[in-house]
């Protein structure tokens, strides 16, 4: 019996654990501190800084099963998903890594043992082919002489992409930096399937399938293109779980493995589909994986960046459900089956199941309102189409008005053999982006581009001032040896008490000083293992190697500590009051306020906000000690410590505890005891995205300031109402009741005045061919009273045509009334349209009553004067 996908995943990790590798958990799909990546798309992403030498781990061998998404930017597989055997938006990448430990020999031997040993995957050796980089003789000889693969199944691949080292078998992290040759392992499905070996003209067939890529990072590519050997070569490998599962389960398509068969059956059940070969089932089965795990990792549907990619995937799935005949919301119902089929890899998702389901359901309901109208519009446009290409402007209008991502439009068009002018769509999108950029004035921070090779030791938990040495200086992102007074720069020290922004806590401010210089620090940021002090040299000069005294702004740090500790208390309180589905989705902790984004599907009730406040203040009054302990990550999680959204943790973590009330992983700075916080007050609660709420709160002196401000406002209101704060509510109720009574009396007076005005107006009506015509401009009459006056006049005059107008704040209001017996000859809508056009407006209504507005008050007299002639012509 073949292994299940879950068993294959576990076997891979167990094998490499037996070879001395640290099993490292999958990192978030949202890359930590890497602006170059939209989503995690490879196993090595979380180790990128280790390979670059900017980060160090307490292990030199690692193995992972990394969750990945490829559905935006460079790696965009979305349009092919569901229509090919191996394209997915979400996949798991099995990998083993060596950080300056073993190299080619062991990497190849490990791979061969896992794939062919009877104890592990037991693949037939004669079915395996390998490729190596053309000049990588070392790898070639290991495969041939040590492993024993015949020469005819070892293929050298040269530079096949038009440049030196541009090859399918040469891997590069970027234009510069670590790179090296790779060897790939292929599985031959047999001659009953079309396709040729890698490097042959038929290589795109499905017979030979790549199952493992092993990268040997042995060079550092320089800006001039030269390759320098790395002092400690490393290994990065990747094997798609779905691909190897297909091989081990003896199927040719990833969608036929046990995991997808189970999901496809679940999709059929919730949509009512009966044909299990329908491609839409495959699309939805794939998309629920990416959508559920993206939401669990903190991405919410929106119209920008990662949120927009998520929205595109959800809407594509919903549209395919619509094609299958789904009559109600269905997508969210697949989260449960997904958790079941993922096994141990779905534990994080299971903890957030309710939240993920609610976000998916809300998004589907919102899109369902526009899906039908959008599809109808698309059908109309396609019916009018004379050629085979839908223009980009129409595709953009569908996106802009109905929320149709262009790939969804392309899906519909592809089913009818119609192309989409994607260049035209992109031009319209770029124009919209240009307008948005001009409106926002957003610009990139050059400091984010700094690369620092040195490391800084943070000593700010125990010190607010200490002596350090300048190890690097940067101006405009470039390393310099010295700076002078007036220059803005980033200063890196060997050790520092300054906290660099992390975990939502802002960076410290303060001063770096010496006998002849003073550098004002306005912010502190991390650059790999270095801590950069960002600011301006106020006086003197500063150079690399200088000794400095680093002084943190103590008062500011103290306020930040209170706010950060209060954030932990509030997080725990929210989970008690609202439920354990609450998890942090983002935060900001500075010296003035704390801001906390969390998962919750509705606005908090006032009484819930009060209970959270009371809970936090109760812990403050308990004056609990705030304790920190360093422990293994897994031990901390077992203890129940909550992790911060988006943070990356080492194997040894800092655990912060406040009695039995709160335990979290945190590297930030905190108060010594909860009592130091003094007072906690929530000042606002609002929504930021579907399923995400935001609380802003203040502590200590800031909270006391808000209490005083509230008291001052109450006193001012009490003074205005000639009362005191003790009976203020009664006073306000009394004023409101009196106001309602006066408004009622005023309305009655207005109606009486209108009735009197109507009586006066009736005498001004003239006879036009047996019909009474009344045309008048009224002053001092509210526009909303015109309708009442027309009704009164129609009752008084019998067969009649009435046009009334008034001007308020430069705007013209018009109304026309026609008695029923005259509407066969004169229609109020046509009449009011004729008048409105002359005063720069438009309007309409029923044959017997119509209203309009206009902007040209000066033209009103002439417009009203034209009514008699127009009516006379109609009544002849």
From Swiss-Prot:
Binding site for Zn(2+): 564, 568, 666, 670
Any one of the GO BP annotations: negative regulation of DNA-templated transcription
Primary localization: cytoplasm
Alphabetized InterPro entries for the sequence: aa-tRNA-synth_II/BPL/LPL, Ala-tRNA-lgiase_IIc, Ala-tRNA-ligase_IIc_anticod-bd, Ala-tRNA-synth_IIc_core, Ala-tRNA-synth_IIc_N, Ala-tRNA_ligase, Ala_tRNA_ligase_euk/bac, DHHA1_dom
Keyword Heme on entry: no
CC per GO annotation: cytosol
Keyword RNA-binding attributed: yes
Cofactor: Zn(2+)
Modified residues (N6-acetyllysine): 74
Molecular-function GO term, any one: zinc ion binding
Residues making up the signal peptide according to the UniProt record: none
UniProt name for this protein: Alanine--tRNA ligase
Organism: Shigella boydii serotype 18 (strain CDC 3083-94 / BS512)
């Amino acid at each position: 019996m073949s292994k299940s996908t879950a068993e294959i995943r576990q076997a891979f990790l167990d094998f490499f654990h037996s070879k001395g590798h640290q099993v490292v958990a999958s990192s978030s799909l949202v890359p930590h501190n890497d602006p170059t990546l939209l989503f995690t798309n490879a196993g090595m992403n979380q180790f990128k800084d280790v390979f670059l030498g900017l980060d160090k781990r307490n292990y030199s061998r690692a193995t992972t099963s990394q969750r990945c998404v490829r559905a935006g930017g460079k790696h965009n597989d979305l349009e092919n998903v569901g229509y090919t055997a191996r394209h997915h938006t979400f996949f798991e990448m099995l990998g083993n890594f060596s950080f300056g430990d073993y190299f080619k020999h062991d990497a190849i031997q490990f791979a061969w043992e896992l794939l062919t040993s009877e104890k592990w995957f037991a693949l037939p050796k004669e079915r395996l082919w390998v490729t190596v980089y053309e000049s990588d003789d070392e790898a070639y000889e290991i495969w041939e002489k040590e492993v024993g693969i015949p020469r005819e199944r070892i293929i050298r691949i040269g530079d096949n992409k038009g440049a030196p080292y541009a090859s399918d078998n040469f891997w590069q992290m970027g234009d510069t930096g670590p790179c090296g040759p790779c060897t790939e392992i292929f599985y031959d499905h047999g001659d009953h399937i079309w396709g040729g070996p890698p490097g042959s003209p038929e290589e795109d067939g499905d017979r030979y399938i790549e199952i493992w890529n092993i990268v040997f990072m042995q060079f550092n590519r320089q800006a001039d293109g030269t390759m320098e050997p790395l002092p400690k070569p490393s290994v990065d490998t990747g094997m798609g779980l779905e691909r190897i599962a297909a091989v081990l389960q003896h199927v040719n398509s990833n969608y036929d493995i046990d995991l997808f068969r189970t999901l496809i059956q679940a999709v059929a059940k919730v949509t009512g589909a009966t044909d299990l070969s329908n491609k839409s089932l495959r699309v939805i089965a794939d998309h629920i994986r990416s959508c559920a795990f993206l939401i669990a990792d903190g991405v919410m549907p929106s119209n920008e960046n990662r949120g927009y990619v998520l929205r595109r995937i959800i809407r594509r799935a919903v549209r395919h459900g619509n094609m299958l005949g789904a009559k109600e919301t269905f997508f969210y119902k697949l989260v449960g089956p997904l958790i079941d089929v993922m096994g141990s890899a779905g534990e994080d998702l299971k903890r957030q199941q309710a939240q993920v389901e609610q976000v998916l359901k809300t998004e589907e309901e919102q899109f369902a309102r526009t899906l039908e109208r959008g599809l109808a519009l698309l059908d109309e446009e396609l019916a009018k189409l004379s050629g085979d290409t839908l223009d980009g402007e129409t595709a953009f209008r569908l996106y802009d008005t109905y929320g149709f991502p262009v790939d969804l439009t392309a899906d519909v068009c592809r089913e009818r053999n119609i192309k989409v002018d994607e260049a035209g769509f992109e031009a319209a999108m770029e124009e919209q982006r240009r307008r948005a950029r001009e409106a926002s004035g957003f610009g990139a921070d050059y400091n984010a581009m700094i690369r620092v090779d040195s490391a800084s030791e943070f000593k700010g938990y125990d010190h607010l001032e200490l002596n350090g040495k300048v190890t690097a200086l940067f101006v405009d992102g470039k390393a310099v040896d010295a700076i002078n007074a007036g220059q803005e720069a980033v200063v890196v020290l060997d050790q520092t008490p300054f906290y660099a922004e992390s975990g939502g806590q802002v960076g410290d401010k303060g001063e770096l000083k010496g006998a002849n210089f003073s550098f004002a620090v306005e912010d502190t940021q991390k650059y790999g293992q270095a801590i950069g002090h960002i600011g301006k040299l106020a006086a003197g000069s500063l150079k690399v190697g200088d000794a400095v005294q680093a002084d943190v702004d103590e008062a500011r740090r103290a306020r930040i500590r209170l706010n950060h500790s209060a954030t932990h208390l509030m997080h725990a309180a929210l989970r008690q009051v609202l439920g354990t589905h609450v998890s942090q989705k983002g935060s900001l902790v500075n010296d003035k306020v704390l801001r906390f984004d969390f998962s919750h599907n509705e606005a908090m009730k006032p009484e819930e906000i009060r209970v959270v406040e009371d809970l936090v203040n109760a812990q403050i009054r308990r004056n609990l000690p705030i304790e920190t302990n360093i422990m293994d990550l897994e031990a901390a999680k077992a203890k129940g410590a909550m992790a911060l959204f988006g943070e990356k943790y080492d194997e040894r973590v800092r655990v912060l505890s406040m009695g039995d009330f709160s335990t979290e992983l945190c590297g930030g700075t905190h108060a010594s005891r909860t009592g130091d916080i003094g007072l906690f007050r929530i000042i606002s609660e609002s929504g930021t995205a579907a399923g995400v709420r935001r609380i802003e709160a203040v502590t200590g002196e800031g909270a006391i300031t808000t209490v005083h401000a509230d008291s001052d406002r109450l006193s001012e209101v009490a003074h205005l109402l000639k009362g005191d704060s003790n009976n203020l509510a009664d006073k306000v109720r009394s004023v409101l009741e009196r106001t309602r009574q006066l408004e009622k009396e005023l309305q009655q007076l207005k109606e009486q005045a209108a009735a009197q005005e109507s009586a006066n107006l009736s005498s001004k009506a003239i006879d036009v061919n047996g019909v009474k015509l009344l045309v008048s401009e009224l002053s001092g009459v509210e526009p909303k009273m015109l309708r009442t006056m027309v009704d009164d006049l129609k009752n008084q005059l019998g067969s009649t045509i009435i046009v009334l107008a008034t001007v308020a704040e430069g705007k013209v209001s018009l109304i026309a009334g026609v008695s029923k017996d005259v509407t066969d000859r004169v229609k109020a809508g046509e009449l009011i349209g004729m008048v409105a056009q002359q005063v720069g407006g438009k309007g309409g209504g029923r044959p017997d009553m119509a209203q309009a507005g206009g902007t040209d008050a000066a033209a009103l007299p002439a417009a009203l004067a034209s009514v008699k002639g127009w009516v006379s012509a109609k009544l002849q």
